[in-house]
């Protein structure tokens, strides 16, 4: 494939796969996993109440949902006692992290995170032209002092702390 239409940022990125899906790992090892914990799934599946709610809502599945998620935001705002304009609804963590980076990181901006944090966050930073600085863990935990020091030294625009 010719890359003459790609942006310079995309052309400069190394070929990489930011996240290897559980299905790909299963193909590599030749068997299904009994628990896919890395995919944030539990081995019990959804509760019967969730299955019933999905079944009841499935009659309208053919309709596009409200793109503003108005009703969901109102329910969450009431539950957490915060303004609904403080809530962002997205189609998953990858997209939400992409929005975060897109909102705050311009070409050349410095961003600090830890080695081993969420892989697609790094992908978004590099994909939008940010400069990524990674800190090692300390005793299998985020090294907060290293993150703070690196952010200060690099004048980072954004610091991502994973949980």
Pin down the residues of each PLM region.
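N-terminal "arm"/small-domain region of PLP-dependent enzymes with the aminotransferase-like
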Residues: 1-63, 161
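Conserved core of the PLP fold type I
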Residues: 62-163
